[in-house]
Each structure stands twice: as structure tokens, then as C-alpha cells.
Amino acid sequence: MVKNIARGGARWLDVAPGRFPRWIASFAERHGDGPPGSSLAITVTSADVIYTAPDGAIAKCFPPFWESRVVLPAYGDPPPAGEAARAIAGHALADRAVGVLLVRLGGYAAGVFTGSPPVLAVHKTGSRLVHGRSAAGGWSQQRFARRREKQASEALKAAAGTAAEVFGRWAEGAVRPGDEERAAGRQPRAGGTRGTGLDVVVFGGDKRAVAEASADPRLAPYAELATGRFLTVPDPKLDVLRDAPRLFLAIRILLTEPPA
């Protein structure tokens, strides 16, 4: 579980889906006066699920790939807190094809994850030289800046091209199970949304670099699949890409405790 401090004394937590139902039960035990989950008020919106305890504690939860009408249609309004937590966890862990593109200046990684838990089915990483900023002045600095701008542009085009290649291979069914997939008995699947073979696309790395790379026309078919969640990662090497499911599956919680 990852913790970060938010404004106003609130805290951001990242909770793995498998731990989420128990986390909600513990939240109820700490802040309620009845059986776990029974004392919590719950509000479901198109963006989040808010649990409010009798003592004023609030857990504002942002599940990944959230579709409230799909996940909680059968539980009434509002749904029971414990059942909702289990449904949210199940939805997060559902088998889906997730395209991932991680970009920082000079480095990039693209891949497709599938299965539950997600397995990296196809991937490609790369790097391009992008010089750091120069402290020199005058014409020398201007020439260096132009060279650096060209290097950065070429690197981001390479990142977009790599993602288009990887996602395209998946959509065309050209991917065959690797060792990990064979061990799990999984096969790549075509279909997805709008024939892309993907259900959702997640970006991460440097926001400015990702914004430019994702605007490349070759990635236009995937624009509508992009989620609002952005993955904060270091240089996108293969091990960083493999760790992406831990980030894109986490249920983000903004926890506000009552005054002491």
C-alpha cells in the first residue's frame, strides 16, 4: 500500500484490489460502531465511490477502469458497503487487454497486458539520445537548443511508432503466447474496442512527453481508450513496464480523518 500526503491533512493511498474489501472493513471498524461495513454510508458517482463513516471519516475511492453502471447495477441505491467493495475489487481484476505506453525523453516502453492477474503478452522498449540543457550562451546555445529539440521530437516519434507497432501486432493476432502466457494457459485475443484488440490504454512517464507522443496520428485509433489515470514511473525500462499493473490496477483512495 502506497501513501502520499494530500492538501488539507488528507492522505492518498494506493490499495491493491485483492486487499480492498478488507481495507474497507478495517475502515469501518476504526470509524464505525457496528459490524464491519454496516455503519458506512456510500455514494456512487460516475468517477468514484465515497465511503463516509459515522465519525466523519471519508474514504473517496477511485477504482481503475470505473464503470459504476456496469459494476454496481444490481445492488440498489445505495449498495451495501461490503458488497460494493467486493464488486469493485472484482471489476479491477477482470480479464481485459490493457495497452501501456510509458515515455520519458530519451526512453520509452510499450506493451499489452492480458489476463487476471495481468501478464505482459507483447512489448518493446527503446531509447534515443536527447542531450541535456546547455549552460552556454549566444549562438552556441541556440544551435544546441535546436539540436536538442530535434532529438526530442525524433525520440517522441519513435515512442509513438513503437506503441503503434506493439498495439497493432496485438490487434492483428500476430502475438503468440510466450513462456509466461503458456504457463498461465492464456492466448492473445483480438476484438477489444473498435477493433483495436484493446479494452483500455494507460499512459505514464513524463506528462509533457506523453502528451506529444500520444498526439501522433498513428495512435489516433487508441485515443478514446485512454484512461484518466497517469502512471508516475522512472525511466521506462522493461522492469518498469512489467510493474505497471501494480499501478494501473490500484484503487486510489483519498482518506480524510476526522479532527482529533
Annotate each language-model stretch with its function.
Residues M1-A260:
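Terminal alpha-helical anchor/extension segments at protein ends
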